[in-house]
Amino acid sequence: MTEPHVAVLSQVQQFLDRQHGLYIDGRPGPAQSEKRLAIFDPATGQEIASTADANEADVDNAVMSAWRAFVSRRWAGRLPAERERILLRFADLVEQHSEELAQLETLEQGKSIAISRAFEVGCTLNWMRYTAGLTTKIAGKTLDLSIPLPQGARYQAWTRKEPVGVVAGIVPWNFPLMIGMWKVMPALAAGCSIVIKPSETTPLTMLRVAELASEAGIPDGVFNVVTGSGAVCGAALTSHPHVAKISFTGSTATGKGIARTAADHLTRVTLELGGKNPAIVLKDADPQWVIEGLMTGSFLNQGQVCAASSRIYIEAPLFDTLVSGFEQAVKSLQVGPGMSPVAQINPLVSRAHCDKVCSFLDDAQAQQAELIRGSNGPAGEGYYVAPTLVVNPDAKLRLTREEVFGPVVNLVRVADGEEALQLANDTEYGLTASVWTQNLSQALEYSDRLQAGTVWVNSHTLIDANLPFGGMKQSGTGRDFGPDWLDGWCETKSVCVRY
């Protein structure tokens, strides 16, 4: 029987058929570079669109457009309530075009249309409206001073928050719309201008969203999009002297390179990088909760999630039960195209990434690791990798220490919780972790001792706009989200008045 597919909207096909350029100064236009980048549907491997491959001159045009918009105060100079209204209108337009954006996301990235609708658009709308509300909550403080000179003088002082300037937002390919808006919205809420560089693999939704931003009333030059390679376009953007802040989400290796570049100009930087995230399952945990929670926490978006649980440490009394449960769950997953409403595992984003993930599994198989695999997906089509459990892998295997970023999960037997903690923290990463237990005292103790920026108890990979998120160790620097989110996009100015 032919697997059902969601019908592609006519406006989506029309957008795919365009000759895409860049989005600079409030309008789409051609790049100076004549090079093009092909965009492929991961489910078929077929080209579906192309975009400009921007060069250094194109990036300079975008940054200078953002700079002119910033210094003219055409956005930062507006009343906070007016900026808030425009950003809420922007969110409303994204909601009105939600199915269009969800389909574009699935066609270029490969993920399930259900995930595109619920996460890429649904969660993005929550973040957009939350962040729009912060626009009118930016506040400084009044301060009492103890300056003794000249004798008898009195002082009044306060601080104020001012937008940092032009922001460079570097967006990964795993959640292009959602993570893109995590950079756009705080920048705009704070009064900054921004230049977004989406991944060259998945640039389409950011180009479309930029058009909606202009329609909402965001002034020309405030929101710009350049598409191109990291080596040329990304490097030119992060090294530009008029960029005041860089917000990057991606690999640790690339993040380190950006940090070195930023140091040359003392550019402010927020880095959300890789993770090799542990889950500790204690012997009193509810097996059903564990299997349901960690199947999502591990295999959401084919494991292409920085926060995914890729190492599961299970106390011995529960190990066999959970291995059996996970095996049954993995083998029941339906594998197919993202535009299929019934497929639960979809293709990886690109041929190159598919080959990389397969290399980890080939290495494990060569070392005679025990692999439990689900369905391989459609034969001869797309970039599919079967969801895979690796049981008690040798510590020397690459997949025990390196971020695989695919549908591959290690199940490891441990004698007790202390061994699990030692193994969980024995990594260069520190993005997320979880502990599974019905004992409140153990939950609190383990959440304290796990070395990760976010620790969940009896859940994994659940985030919220009001909860700060970021990494320890080599998983990054800085925090996104939460009521103080905009502090990272503002300068703090001190004002002192003698009277």
UniProtKB/Swiss-Prot annotation:
Its EC number is 1.2.1.39. It is an enzyme of class 1 (oxidoreductase). CDD domains: ALDH_PADH_NahF (cd07113). NAD(+) binds at G250, S251, T252, A253, T254, G255. It holds the Pfam family Aldedh. Keywords: NAD, Oxidoreductase. One of its GO terms (cellular component) is protein-containing complex. The keyword Glycosyltransferase does not apply. The keyword ATP-binding does not apply. One of its GO terms (molecular function) is oxidoreductase activity. The active site is at E272, C306. Can also use NADP, but prefers NAD. Homodimer. Acts almost equally well on phenylacetaldehyde, 4-hydroxyphenylacetaldehyde and 3,4-dihydroxyphenylacetaldehyde. This is Phenylacetaldehyde dehydrogenase. It comes from Escherichia coli (strain K12).
